[in-house]
């Protein structure tokens, strides 16, 4: 069966949550038995996000095949549980590079290379490739940036051409825009969104669905006005109100009738739930559609029973997960000591993995972000971590804040504070233990001190220390866990696959010293033998992992390491109360 394509654009302002909406739509379709794949097209000229400043771009999400991609791919995976690849994240820079390389190789036969058709053709080819390589029934493509930005024009033109070829039954446009509320007049204003749609219409793209991003529920008058002036059917004016959690968004959109509407417009009924077609939720069903009894969503007309018919989605487990998130029975505080803590998106997958672990234990995780540069001694660390029930040090690069992290780990080790070190966090644990337990006072990493006499952390074989992209150990690798280790027990198996993004690791020359100590290597790469897991045998819960477990965590399937960390934190809290 020929694939269908959904394109999501954004208007008025950036950072409205197109990626969350795209992931939520993927979940709504997948819950109806429809195979989906999400992808992101960014208009910036960087080759990929790998070398971009975390303060500007947020985290780099690593795919199974080693792609350094936009953080929205993390949203896609957490919502749909469909693994992404490097090809699901495309930048304008990678598009232009491919075209210029092809031109230099004579691929265009001497023709004049232009934005149209060459750039737009390359974009279209990459959009279609997602369907060809995955076999997905629906390809959901998010176009980054904001409509009206000059750099987005080739992408908008490319999707216009795709619609011209495929028609409305195989191609659907969703435009997400802000509908602000002005307290001064007590009204929601539609004019910014109207002008955004006008800009899109000027580029030849007529939205089929408008997602109204708002802080308040939109009124019927707002729906009517947008329907009239944006030339969009009233039932396709969909509220996208701010939720307590991003994981409620799919349920809110389903209550608005969006899932059934998409199935109807793209004629997906025959592929839904084995061909069983059921009527969409009727009037008054919005509350149960979202959370069931005790839910938070209004039932006074926010649902549109005229949205047509579509297969009933199976969102039972998702609703249960959101209920567990909203109604915790316990709480704990997890401290995160890092380099980029002023921007939460820099550690987005870590925070979402902790949230998922909290859901698993019906516990609310209060995340306390601590700037590593503000810790100058072990005493400082003690004050900063006094109320923490667990500590996480996530990944990072560069020397800034390293000594503060070492002090934090020293406090955690001595005070029996549950600790999880991720990537750089494992290296910090190794350095701290070498200095204070193995008595190698000048121990360090060659990344931060090239001339250290005790480089307990060093470059891995085959890696090159360069700031340029493509020089890291990237992607999914197999790790073998030692018999009798705690790591093996909490995973429940001896072989695990985890994603990596690093070039440094435990120096093999010092491995024997650690094996004879309390901080033992218990997980190694199955091919090269590099140490990937260390655990402290004399500590209640102390692990360092060279990989990034946060990338494999899901809101309804917490990663074993985070799940066990939260359990240890809760146990510590109980013991102190």
Curated annotation (Swiss-Prot):
Q: What is its EC number?
A: 6.3.4.2
State where L-glutamine binds.
Answer: 55, 396, 424-427, 447, 503
UniProt: ATP binding residues: 15-20, 72
- Spans annotated as Amidoligase domain: 1-268
Residues the entry annotates as binding UTP: 14, 189-194, 225
Its annotated pathway reads: Pyrimidine metabolism; CTP biosynthesis via de novo pathway; CTP from UDP: step 2/2
The UniProt record lists the Glutamine amidotransferase type-1 domain at 333-575
**Reactions it catalyzes:** UTP + L-glutamine + ATP + H2O = CTP + L-glutamate + ADP + phosphate + 2 H(+); L-glutamine + H2O = L-glutamate + NH4(+); UTP + NH4(+) + ATP = CTP + ADP + phosphate + 2 H(+)
Q: How does it assemble?
A: Homotetramer.
Other information: CTPSs have evolved a hybrid strategy for distinguishing between UTP and CTP. The overlapping regions of the product feedback inhibitory and substrate sites recognize a common feature in both compounds, the triphosphate moiety. To differentiate isosteric substrate and product pyrimidine rings, an additional pocket far from the expected kinase/ligase catalytic site, specifically recognizes the cytosine and ribose portions of the product inhibitor.
Family to which the UniProt record says this protein belongs: Belongs to the CTP synthase family.
Question: Which HAMAP family does the entry mention?
Answer: PyrG
Q: What is this protein called?
A: CTP synthase
| Record organism | Treponema pallidum subsp. pallidum (strain SS14)
- Organism taxonomic ancestry: Bacteria, Pseudomonadati, Spirochaetota, Spirochaetia, Spirochaetales
């Amino acid at each position: 069966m020929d694939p269908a394509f959904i394109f999501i654009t954004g208007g008025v302002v950036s950072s409205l949550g197109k990626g969350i909406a795209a992931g939520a739509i993927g979940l709504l379709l997948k819950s109806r038995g429809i195979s989906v794949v999400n992808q992101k097209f960014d208009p910036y000229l960087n080759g990929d996000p790998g070398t971009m400043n975390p303060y500007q771009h947020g985290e780099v999400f690593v795919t199974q095949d080693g792609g350094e991609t936009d953080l929205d791919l993390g949203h896609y995976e957490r919502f749909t549980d469909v693994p992404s690849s490097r090809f699901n994240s495309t930048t304008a820079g990678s598009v232009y590079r491919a075209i210029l390389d092809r031109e230099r190789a004579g691929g265009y036969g001497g023709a004049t290379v232009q934005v149209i058709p060459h750039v737009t053709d390359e974009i279209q080819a990459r959009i279609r490739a997602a369907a060809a390589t995955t076999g997905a029934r629906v390809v959901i493509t998010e176009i980054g940036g904001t409509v009206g930005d000059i750099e987005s024009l080739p992408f908008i033109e490319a999707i216009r051409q795709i619609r011209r070829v495929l028609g409305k039954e195989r191609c659907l446009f969703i435009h997400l825009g802000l509908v602000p509320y002005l307290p001064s007049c007590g009204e929601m204003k539609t004019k910014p969104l109207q002008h955004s749609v006008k800009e899109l219409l000027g580029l030849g793209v007529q939205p089929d669905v408008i997602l109204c991003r708002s802080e308040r529920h939109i009124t019927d008058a707002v729906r009517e006005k947008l329907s009239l002036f944006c030339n969009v059917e009233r039932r396709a004016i969909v509220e996208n109100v701010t939720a307590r959690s991003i994981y409620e968004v799919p349920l809110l959109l389903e209550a608005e009738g969006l899932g059934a509407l998409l199935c109807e417009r793209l004629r997906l009924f025959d592929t839904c739930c084995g061909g069983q077609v059921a009527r969409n939720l009727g009037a008054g069903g919005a509350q149960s559609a979202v959370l069931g009894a005790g839910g938070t969503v209004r039932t006074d007309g926010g649902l549109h029973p005229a949205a047509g018919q579509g297969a009933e989605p199976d969102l039972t487990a998702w609703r249960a997960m959101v209920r567990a998130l909203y109604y915790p029975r316990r709480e704990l505080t997890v401290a995160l000591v890092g380099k980029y803590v002023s921007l939460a998106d820099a550690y987005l997958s870590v925070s979402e993995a902790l949230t998922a672990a909290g859901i698993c234990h019906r516990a609310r995780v209060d995340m306390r972000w601590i700037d590593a540069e503000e810790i100058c001694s072990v005493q400082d660390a003690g004050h900063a971590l006094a109320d923490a029930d667990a500590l996480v040090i996530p990944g990072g690069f560069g020397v800034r804040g390293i000594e503060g992290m070492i002090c934090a780990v020293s406090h955690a080790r001595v005070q029996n504070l549950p600790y999880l070190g991720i990537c750089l966090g494992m290296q910090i644990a190794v350095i701290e233990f070498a200095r204070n337990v193995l008595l190698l006072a000048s121990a360090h990493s060659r990344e931060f001190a090239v001339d250290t006499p005790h480089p307990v952390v060093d470059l891995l074989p085959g890696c090159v220390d360069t700031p340029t992209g493509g020089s890291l150990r990237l992607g999914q690798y197999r790790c073998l866990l030692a018999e009798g280790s705690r790591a093996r027990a909490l995973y429940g198996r001896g072989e695990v696959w985890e994603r990596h993004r690093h070039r440094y690791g435990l120096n093999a020359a010092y491995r024997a010293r650690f094996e004879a100590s309390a901080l033992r290597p218990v997980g190694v790469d199955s091919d090269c033998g590099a140490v990937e897991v260390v655990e402290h045998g004399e500590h209640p819960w102390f692990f360092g992992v060279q990989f990034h477990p946060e990338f494999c965590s899901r809101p309804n399937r917490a990663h074993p390491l985070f799940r066990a960390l939260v359990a240890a934190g809760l146990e510590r809290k109980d013991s102190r109360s």
